[in-house]
């Protein structure tokens, strides 16, 4: 006789989280391993947590790629790496004027946070000064929150960015520590954690997440969420691998839409009070179930990513309105 598996009470687990009871790693794994027929129940439960902390608000972020390609690191997922053969645009730093223009485009797209991103291992002091000049002008002329993602930082650079008015610094953990050597050999997992800590020590809000679907196990996928909890990331971008042709991970099997939804729900259960953003791979991996993702996440990027295209801002605005949600402008 076939044994009937007992279903979890996902709503009860959600209400436990609302009452500030932390879920276990076993609970997180159970979400990821749940039968696909349970995914709507899981997302409904995740929404209980999301609504408790964020209501119906959705935060919009916009990226500007201020320096593309030319990166000496060998991250296997990245089309900007020196080892990548992907046909992308490659250029040195945009002018401060272009960076400031991008901020005004972010406002037109109804974004509250503007993300200044540059490829490379770490910025020079001259490059940090270049960014600071743009940041100061943006701060003087807009109400945007500013996030930077410039690579590894030292204490002095982090302090100067904070003093200039940078609100948030992004440096993703990318994958589980056990999986890191298979993704990159030119720096370590601990190097990435160190930069997150330096930003936080400087008084900058830490943003750190991962790219799911790079060969990590289900258990490691859950442990990533708890590691992000441990380092106290305020904002958690959940990226889903796009196996770009010309990168070492070309051909890697990408996550299904349902697998992506389970990741988002699990992340909300583990990090209930944090901004969880559906990031790279949203349109490609989630496809027609993108709106369901916002029942767990409360943030998205609007417009294009670093080297891959996003959907039109009007499509994102429409998706948010159709859900009965509201855009939260100029909020970190």
Swiss-Prot record:
Pathway annotation: Cofactor biosynthesis; biotin biosynthesis; biotin from 7,8-diaminononanoate: step 2/2
Signal peptide as annotated in the record: none
Top enzyme class: transferase
Keywords, comma-separated and alphabetical: 2Fe-2S, 4Fe-4S, Biotin biosynthesis, Iron, Iron-sulfur, Metal-binding, S-adenosyl-L-methionine, Transferase
Superkingdom classification of source: Bacteria
GO MF assignments: 2 iron, 2 sulfur cluster binding; 4 iron, 4 sulfur cluster binding; biotin synthase activity; iron ion binding
InterPro entries: Aldolase_TIM, BATS_dom, Biotin_synth/BioAB, Biotin_synthase, Elp3/MiaA/NifB-like_rSAM, rSAM
UniProt: [2Fe-2S] cluster binding residues: 115, 147, 207, 277
EC nos: 2.8.1.6
Enzymatic reactions: (4R,5S)-dethiobiotin + (sulfur carrier)-SH + 2 reduced [2Fe-2S]-[ferredoxin] + 2 S-adenosyl-L-methionine = (sulfur carrier)-H + biotin + 2 5'-deoxyadenosine + 2 L-methionine + 2 oxidized [2Fe-2S]-[ferredoxin]
Positions that bind [4Fe-4S] cluster: 71, 75, 78
GO biological process: biotin biosynthetic process
HAMAP family: BioB (MF_01694)
Reported function: Catalyzes the conversion of dethiobiotin (DTB) to biotin by the insertion of a sulfur atom into dethiobiotin via a radical-based mechanism.
Name listed for the protein in its UniProt record: Biotin synthase
Organism for this UniProt entry: Bacillus cereus (strain G9842)
